[in-house]
Amino acid sequence: MSEGTDLKELKRRMDGAIAAFKSDIASLRTGRASANILDPVTIEAYGSRMPLNQVANITVPEPRMLSVSVWDKSMVGAVERGIRESNLGLNPIIDGQNLRIPLPELNEERRRSLVKVAHEYAEKAKVAIRHVRRDGMDGLKKAEKDGDIGQDEGRSLSERVQKMTDETISDIDRLLVDKEKEIMQV
């Protein structure tokens, strides 16, 4: 196990888990409109399921309004259906080839359920980070057993992997707290 390469690879994989977590929580709705809210929406189009952003353009014309411009007029109904069925609590209004989506005020119950979803995303990210840590530790044990590295070097590297894991998990916790505040802000 070459120390620099594998630690860099572990760090890259942990950073990937953070990036995925950031993407997940960006799609959670707060009091402000954001095109990311519609990221989880998929549409039945051309014989398969496609992400909404592959059949339409999403903009934020007003703080509490989303606008979806469907590229193919024949897809407007499918886009509306996909948004309604997405369990986001949104009711699009068809306006020609566009859909206007007013964002209702978030009530306390909905805010709490969004916080719960954010916690689930955080836990998923932490599990991914722990898997990366386990892979790193297993690699160190194997290298130590094969005689590629000494016991002291193995212990030193495993401490660095653990430190990297702890820092990455604390980054996830910090991002989660920030998102919680953003969601609960009235």
From Swiss-Prot:
One Gene Ontology biological process: cytoplasmic translational termination
Region Disordered, annotated ranges: 140-163
Keywords linked to the UniProt accession: Cytoplasm, Protein biosynthesis
A Pfam family per the record: RRF
Chief site of localization: cytoplasm
Subcellular location: Cytoplasm
Single GO MF annotation: ribosomal large subunit binding
GO CC, one annotated term: cytosol
Function per UniProt: Responsible for the release of ribosomes from messenger RNA at the termination of protein biosynthesis. May increase the efficiency of translation by recycling ribosomes from one round of translation to another.
Name of this chain's protein: Ribosome-recycling factor
Organism: Rhizobium rhizogenes (strain K84 / ATCC BAA-868) (Agrobacterium radiobacter)
